[in-house]
């Protein structure tokens, strides 16, 4: 009984999503709708340009900033925040991504220390109006 209590007391505390997500992420795989268009290291990628995709989320003294380099190699900067633990919101993006009004929203499907899976909540004009899913890793 005592051994069980000691073992239970030694569990590693899981950092909040706001801490785990604040890092530089690169694309491991990307889906446009149900179609996988990019897999890191893949030879038959439909959208090989995702090799340059980068989402960098920083939190410095409570100031949350984002830099997003998209599939077309354009970089957008702004702010980010979470709504609960399941929604990532990028705001004040400059220049504003096409049709976004400077705001992009993603569902956080899953997250751990080295991987996050995000689904964009609105269709992307850049990818023919698809809802895209991004599996991102760090490093």
What are these regions (language model features)?
Residues 11-77, 83-139:
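Lipid interaction determinants
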